[in-house]
Amino acid sequence: MGDHAWSFLKDFLAGGVAAAVSKTAVAPIERVKLLLQVQHASKQISAEKQYKGIIDCVVRIPKEQGFLSFWRGNLANVIRYFPTQALNFAFKDKYKQLFLGGVDRHKQFWRYFAGNLASGGAAGATSLCFVYPLDFARTRLAADVGKGAAQREFHGLGDCIIKIFKSDGLRGLYQGFNVSVQGIIIYRAAYFGVYDTAKGMLPDPKNVHIFVSWMIAQSVTAVAGLVSYPFDTVRRRMMMQSGRKGADIMYTGTVDCWRKIAKDEGAKAFFKGAWSNVLRGMGGAFVLVLYDEIKKYV
């Protein structure tokens, strides 16, 4: 094995451990966020049983479903990391060459900006093609509020994928795919635009203290996450459609989903669980910083 391949494998495995630790640590926040996002589209949660907010959700989950249910869907989320990273690594440079070859960042800023969006969107869409069923299963497992085996809609990752595939075919596992790609592009546009602006405002962008860099990254991630959050809400709601038939189908398509959420629930509904998303990002970053510190002594 060459040095390059060995280096990639080490980073890949170390990153996988870090991802597993950080995702597992913030999984309860992630589940709260997902439940707040999709409860209106859930057959299991009637109007009177809907969660009133983050605190209500955190208090009721262990009471109604057991403490370990905070980690429902986490395995799919951890597994998803490995193919996503491998695919990103495989496609990233190819898309950069295609969209950014010969573009000067300083002299052709807007072309560079557009190329960055295109390469990020293309790389994201390519890896999503392969890992989307895992993301789908993670959402459906997290949204499953049944307590015992008899009340659960799905009994695990494999059961979820098989049931939906039998019911709706491959299309059922890719509900909300289009809006997911749109969300990636919007996220990258916000992230790239805000990050560059923030760094450009510093007196010496090349010599920035690690804490300042971390604060900028946190702020930019939070802003980009909020800007693209409505797309995430719509895609999760679309995921909840799979396996439904006839009158049970709430949304006829993505456009109908946008329209009905705005009309029936108001614009605020697009941002349900957004605050927990910000907390999750901070928690994940903290765990990764901790992991880097531990790695120094191992």
Swiss-Prot record:
<keyword id="KW-0677">Repeat</keyword>
<feature type="binding site">
    <location>
        <position position="235"/>
    </location>
    <ligand>
        <name>ADP</name>
    </ligand>
</feature>
<keyword id="KW-0935">Progressive external ophthalmoplegia</keyword>
<dbReference type="InterPro" id="IPR018108">
    <property type="entry name" value="Mitochondrial_sb/sol_carrier"/>
</dbReference>
<dbReference type="GO" id="GO:0008637">
    <property type="term" value="P:apoptotic mitochondrial changes"/>
</dbReference>
<keyword id="KW-1133">Transmembrane helix</keyword>
<dbReference type="InterPro" id="IPR002067">
    <property type="entry name" value="Mit_carrier"/>
</dbReference>
<dbReference type="GO" id="GO:0005471">
    <property type="term" value="F:ATP:ADP antiporter activity"/>
</dbReference>
<dbReference type="GO" id="GO:0006091">
    <property type="term" value="P:generation of precursor metabolites and energy"/>
</dbReference>
<feature type="topological domain" description="Mitochondrial matrix">
    <location>
        <begin position="38"/>
        <end position="74"/>
    </location>
</feature>
<keyword id="KW-0597">Phosphoprotein</keyword>
<dbReference type="GO" id="GO:0015207">
    <property type="term" value="F:adenine transmembrane transporter activity"/>
</dbReference>
<dbReference type="Pfam" id="PF00153">
    <property type="entry name" value="Mito_carr"/>
</dbReference>
<keyword id="KW-0050">Antiport</keyword>
<dbReference type="GO" id="GO:0060546">
    <property type="term" value="P:negative regulation of necroptotic process"/>
</dbReference>
<keyword id="KW-0999">Mitochondrion inner membrane</keyword>
<feature type="modified residue" description="N6-succinyllysine">
    <location>
        <position position="147"/>
    </location>
</feature>
<feature type="transmembrane region" description="Helical; Name=5">
    <location>
        <begin position="211"/>
        <end position="231"/>
    </location>
</feature>
<keyword id="KW-0496">Mitochondrion</keyword>
<protein>
    <recommendedName>
        <fullName>ADP/ATP translocase 1</fullName>
    </recommendedName>
</protein>
<comment type="subunit">
    <text>Monomer. Found in a complex with ARL2, ARL2BP and SLC25A4/ANT1. Interacts with ARL2BP. Interacts with ARHGAP11B, thereby inhibiting the mitochondrial permeability transition pore (mPTP). Interacts with TIMM44; leading to inhibit the presequence translocase TIMM23, thereby promoting stabilization of PINK1.</text>
</comment>
<dbReference type="GO" id="GO:0017077">
    <property type="term" value="F:oxidative phosphorylation uncoupler activity"/>
</dbReference>
<feature type="transmembrane region" description="Helical; Name=6">
    <location>
        <begin position="274"/>
        <end position="291"/>
    </location>
</feature>
<dbReference type="GO" id="GO:0005743">
    <property type="term" value="C:mitochondrial inner membrane"/>
</dbReference>
<feature type="repeat" description="Solcar 2">
    <location>
        <begin position="111"/>
        <end position="201"/>
    </location>
</feature>
<keyword id="KW-0812">Transmembrane</keyword>
<feature type="topological domain" description="Mitochondrial intermembrane">
    <location>
        <begin position="292"/>
        <end position="298"/>
    </location>
</feature>
<dbReference type="GO" id="GO:1901029">
    <property type="term" value="P:negative regulation of mitochondrial outer membrane permeabilization involved in apoptotic signaling pathway"/>
</dbReference>
<feature type="modified residue" description="N6-succinyllysine">
    <location>
        <position position="245"/>
    </location>
</feature>
<feature type="modified residue" description="N-acetylglycine">
    <location>
        <position position="2"/>
    </location>
</feature>
<feature type="modified residue" description="Phosphoserine">
    <location>
        <position position="7"/>
    </location>
</feature>
<dbReference type="GO" id="GO:0016020">
    <property type="term" value="C:membrane"/>
</dbReference>
<feature type="topological domain" description="Mitochondrial matrix">
    <location>
        <begin position="232"/>
        <end position="273"/>
    </location>
</feature>
<keyword id="KW-1274">Primary mitochondrial disease</keyword>
<feature type="short sequence motif" description="Nucleotide carrier signature motif">
    <location>
        <begin position="235"/>
        <end position="240"/>
    </location>
</feature>
<feature type="modified residue" description="N6,N6,N6-trimethyllysine">
    <location>
        <position position="52"/>
    </location>
</feature>
<feature type="transmembrane region" description="Helical; Name=4">
    <location>
        <begin position="179"/>
        <end position="199"/>
    </location>
</feature>
<dbReference type="GO" id="GO:0015866">
    <property type="term" value="P:ADP transport"/>
</dbReference>
<dbReference type="GO" id="GO:0000002">
    <property type="term" value="P:mitochondrial genome maintenance"/>
</dbReference>
<comment type="similarity">
    <text>Belongs to the mitochondrial carrier (TC 2.A.29) family.</text>
</comment>
<feature type="binding site">
    <location>
        <position position="80"/>
    </location>
    <ligand>
        <name>ADP</name>
    </ligand>
</feature>
<dbReference type="GO" id="GO:0046902">
    <property type="term" value="P:regulation of mitochondrial membrane permeability"/>
</dbReference>
